[in-house]
Amino acid sequence: MHYKLLFAAAAASLASAVSAAGVVGAAEGFAHGVTGGGSASPVYPTTTDELVSYLGDNEPRVIILDRTFDFTGTEGTETTTGCAPWGTASQCQVAINLHSWCDNYQASAPKVSVTYDKAGILPITVNSNKSIVGQGTKGVIKGKGLRVVSGAKNVIIQNIAVTDINPKYVWGGDAITVDDSDLVWIDHVTTARIGRQHIVLGTSADNRVTISYSLIDGRSDYSATCNGHHYWGVYLDGSNDMVTLKGNYFYNLSGRMPKVQGNTLLHAVNNLFHNFDGHAFEIGTGGYVLAEGNVFQDVNTVVETPISGQLFSSPDANTNQQCASVFGRSCQLNAFGNSGSMSGSDTSIISKFAGKTIAAAHPPGNIAQWTMKNAGQGK
């Protein structure tokens, strides 16, 4: 079967999103069944205050974003003393002393003056039963992120961009936060120029999450590795989490892509990891990772060592047949171009998927080309 047929549904969903007043398609993998705002009549916020109100109220909502909502300057700026753990060169991020982080963890780092935009620090609260959908390439939230927390569930974030959240400053803000939640689908989202994490799942149970066909764009003038490659990618740290990463484009990063620990079962399938000056996977205690059908192109270190968690890297055709007992198929090989290796043959992870909704996987042959054309907002 040709890839243009295998991925036709995903590609068609993005093409039609320009005019569709609502969610297109359905979540694959662990967040399968999420409905967001369902059949609620679409609303079109026109101001930042209206957007915050719609996202935070208790009504099921289909919220259509047809413009840029720029939060920069809406809460003023703060000038204070921070620190420079990675040096003071022009490409290095410096850190805000949020919750005394510099004092407690970087006491020997040089002190520096920091001036940051206060709106970026605390993301917008998204309550249960919300669909946030961008119209074409128009739906942008700038200078502030989103957070699905404190028991919120059944949330869809589709076809938007979240950008420009204090990119010079660690602790300047995250793009999307999920914590103490369930059934969250992040789809065809672009994140760019973020101070801290592009996506973070916090330490409470975040349960069922799918991140699909999204672009994590790590290009930045500032990074913790001082090389123009953003370090803080995707951090999965929940206490009872099942996460599907499918069809995403992870570009120009240097670390935490993803960092997996806590008690997190991760299915990483058919993603493109491209142009990393650093490491991709970081697997800590309580991280259970099954990776198949992914492409690693120009990635220095595919998996940081030592691995404290568990990894099944779909290492060879014979071993991959063991997936059939739970998946109903063999797992797909990963592909590597000018990249490091990925070694992990812990087949015990396969049984953890029993009874779960498992995303389909395709061979990696055309994944890179397809993903570059189709992942992210408006594609």
Curated annotation (Swiss-Prot):
Top enzyme class: lyase
EC number: 4.2.2.10
Glycosylation sites: 129, 252
Location(s) in or outside the cell: Secreted
Signal peptide: 1-20
GO cellular component: extracellular region
Single GO biological process annotation from the record: cell wall organization
Coiled coil: none
One Pfam family hit: Pectate_lyase_4
Active site positions: 256
The keyword Disulfide bond is assigned to this record: yes
Disulfide bridges in this chain: 83-102, 92-226, 323-331
Keywords, comma-separated and alphabetical: Carbohydrate metabolism, Cell wall biogenesis/degradation, Disulfide bond, Glycoprotein, Lyase, Polysaccharide degradation, Secreted, Signal
Task performed by this protein: Pectinolytic enzymes consist of four classes of enzymes: pectin lyase, polygalacturonase, pectin methylesterase and rhamnogalacturonase. Among pectinolytic enzymes, pectin lyase is the most important in depolymerization of pectin, since it cleaves internal glycosidic bonds of highly methylated pectins.
Name of the featured protein: Probable pectin lyase B
Organism: Aspergillus niger (strain ATCC MYA-4892 / CBS 513.88 / FGSC A1513)
Designated gene of the protein: pelB
